A protein has these predicted regions:
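Hydrophobic anchor residue at the start of the ABC signature
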Residues: 12
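Catalytic Walker B motif of ABC-type/P-loop ATPase nucleotide-binding domains
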Residues: 23-27
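Conserved H-loop
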Residues: 50-57
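Conserved beta-strand-loop-alpha-helix hinge in the C-terminal portion
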Residues: 75-106
Length: 115
């Protein structure tokens, strides 16, 4: 029986091995320890850099580190709000990027406003 983290790794490996032009990833790093999460984010961003990826995550820093565009889906019925962050450098962004903490703070405030 595989642990949650091992199941995540197997699922992620399958996605990375398939040659699909569009990839949907729903919380792909959620059951991983911090170091493995960071390493797999790096690997995933590099291996999928020429594909369209829709990443669903509840982690604002992960979204900002890996995304080209950020959108929030909320409400019932659901509405999508596109955020205008200037994500100029390519993912995966390094954690000491001076803009990441500022953007993370702004994104967290926006998420709180939506509750």
């Amino acid at each position: 029986q595989l642990s949650g983290g091992m199941q995540q790794r197997v699922a992620l490996a399958r996605v990375l091995l398939e040659d699909r032009p569009i990839v949907l990833m729903d919380e792909p790093f959620s059951a991983l320890d911090t170091i493995t999460r960071y390493q797999l984010q790096e690997l995933t961003a590099n291996l999928l850099k020429n594909r369209t990826v829709l990443l669903v995550t509840h982690d604002p820093l992960e979204a900002l580190r890996l995304g080209h565009h950020i959108a929030i889906m909320s409400g019932n019925p659901a509405k999508i709000e596109y955020l205008n962050y200037k994500l100029s450098d390519l993912p995966p962004r390094v954690l000491d990027n001076p803009h990441l903490l500022k953007w993370q703070s702004q994104l967290l405030h926006r998420l709180q406003e939506l509750q």
